[in-house]
Amino acid sequence: MVVLAAAIVVKSGKVIVSRHYVDMSRIRIEGLLAAFPKLVGMGKQHTYIETENVRYVYQPIEALFLLLVTTKQSNILEDLATLTLLSKLVPEYSMSLDEEGISRASFELIFAFDEVISLGHKESVTVAQVKQYCEMESHEEKLHKLVMQSKINDTKDVMKRKANEIDKSKIEKNKPGGFSSMGSMGSGRLESGFNELSISSGGGGGYGSGSGFGMISDVDPINTKPKDRSRSSVTAPPKSSGMKLGKSGKNQLMESLKAEGEDVIEDVKPTGQSKAAAPPPTDPFTLTVEEKLNVALRRDGGLSSFDMQGTLSLQILNQEDGFVQVQIATGENPEILFKTHPNINRDMFNNENILGLKRPDQPFPTGQGGDGVGLLRWRMQRADESMVPLTINCWPSVSGNETYVSLEYEASSMFDLTNVIISVPLPALREAPSVRQCDGEWRYDPRNSVLEWSILLIDNSNRSGSMEFVVPPVDSSVFFPISVQFAATSTYSGLKVTGMIPLRGGGGATPRFVQRTQLIAQNYQVI
């Protein structure tokens, strides 16, 4: 068996991919392949055609021909086995069996052909082995990546411990002095009980007994940066008139990153007018009602999954104000299941809708970071699409050398959505897509190849909208999954704080408090 060449040609005779395995000139290969389409129409066989010098063994693949050019002395049965193996490999490396798809995967196909045929002879391999050889996976490379990831995780743990130590030192500094030892011990014991039963807002949900419920905050150790030593107040050296190579090089780097679509935050010296960090709470009590949505919509319509998790947290400014109870009102939604913190009096909540500690002589802990102490949480899971606040429809269609994509959104009347961002993944493009129509604003991220559709506010004036853009021809699966971000000031539960009940002092007056309510899309996709 001697295979002279393996090729993929169109029925008109145009060669897309060709690989020859013997010493043969390009003119001869092109002549043999150019003569093949004329012989197909004349011959009566459907698997091979013989000429005076060579034999063509071929197989149709939609509008193409997979072709082996062999000598006449070659074993026809082995040639057919080789052709069958190659026909199984072609769909593995080409998404579409047309001229453009084969051209895009031409190098991968040549590498796969080389694994099957060596010096004109068939190798004893399978499709799985060929894919493994072409992937060229390295055990040492995987081990190196695991070691690097382990180092990164260790560094994050160290940064997290440092951040916790800094937070604890700040709390210790802010604690007022003069308390008796018994009072300090009691407060510390209760505060530790809340901390030990804290819940992470990014976890995998569920009301199992293993998850606690306390301080609701995610401390990102990466954002806790030490003070830049280069900005300390030292005597500035005298200015020189020499060339400032470092400055110009830095500016060029910044400009190049901006040209590639990267968001660059320039390192500037702080001034008195620069934006400061978020101010600390000034009100005695701050209550936060937050609901997070995790929704997966099907691209052909319907709901795949719906999960809403809500929390109510309390942040107290002063230690002496911790002897309080919280009066709430819940909406009439029987599908929402409420669960209190273990230190909260469950019977009082069920009978009077009041959140108070089991031990009224102990205050709520103060000095908690983030949103404060978690008091209540709830959850709702539905399979009804009518509860979804926003649905997205994506309609891609290929016409000639272009793919027309039509996007539509429909918003429910239950919520007014703000800061809506619909992110559509795109194939790798040399330039931004051609946007024909857009209700709102759009932005193309070339680094991540994502088209972002932004709507500042969705209310009764624009419950529906559309966007149309054009890209080169691609498979429709490229545009999924579509990610959606938004926020709202109303919630599914309708939970509201109606008042604060002081247990000590206050003269019966209702303490002043601030309530913050928000609904956010944590993981909202069209798959």
Curated annotation (Swiss-Prot):
* Chief location bin: cytoplasm
Which ranges are annotated Basic and acidic residues under compositional bias?
166-175
Q: What is its quaternary makeup? A: Oligomeric complex that consists of at least the alpha, beta, beta', gamma, delta, epsilon and zeta subunits.
Q: Please explain the role this protein plays, according to its UniProt record.
A: The coatomer is a cytosolic protein complex that binds to dilysine motifs and reversibly associates with Golgi non-clathrin-coated vesicles, which further mediate biosynthetic protein transport from the ER, via the Golgi up to the trans Golgi network. Coatomer complex is required for budding from Golgi membranes, and is essential for the retrograde Golgi-to-ER transport of dilysine-tagged proteins.
Task: Name the family the entry cites.
Answer: Belongs to the adaptor complexes medium subunit family. Delta-COP subfamily.
What the entry lists under InterPro entries is as follows: AP2_Mu_C_sf, Coatomer_dsu, Longin-like_dom_sf, MHD
Q: Gene3D superfamilies this protein is in?
A: 3.30.450.60, Mu homology domain, subdomain B
Subcellular locations according to the entry: Cytoplasm; Golgi apparatus membrane; Cytoplasmic vesicle, COPI-coated vesicle membrane
Q: Which SUPFAM superfamilies match?
A: Second domain of Mu2 adaptin subunit (ap50) of ap2 adaptor (SSF49447), SNARE-like (SSF64356)
- Compositionally biased tracts (Low complexity): 177-187, 239-250
Q: What would be one Gene Ontology cellular-component term for the protein?
A: plasmodesma
State the protein's name.
Coatomer subunit delta
Keywords, A to Z, come to:
Cytoplasm, Cytoplasmic vesicle, ER-Golgi transport, Golgi apparatus, Membrane, Protein transport, Transport
Q: Which organism is it from?
A: Arabidopsis thaliana (Mouse-ear cress)
Q: Which residue positions does the secretion signal occupy?
A: none
UniProt-listed GO biological process terms: protein transport; retrograde vesicle-mediated transport, Golgi to endoplasmic reticulum
Q: Where is this region: Disordered?
A: 166-187, 217-250
Q: What does the record give as the organism's lineage?
A: Eukaryota, Viridiplantae, Streptophyta, Embryophyta, Tracheophyta
Q: How does it sit in the membrane?
A: Peripheral membrane protein
Question: Which segments constitute the MHD domain?
Answer: 282-527
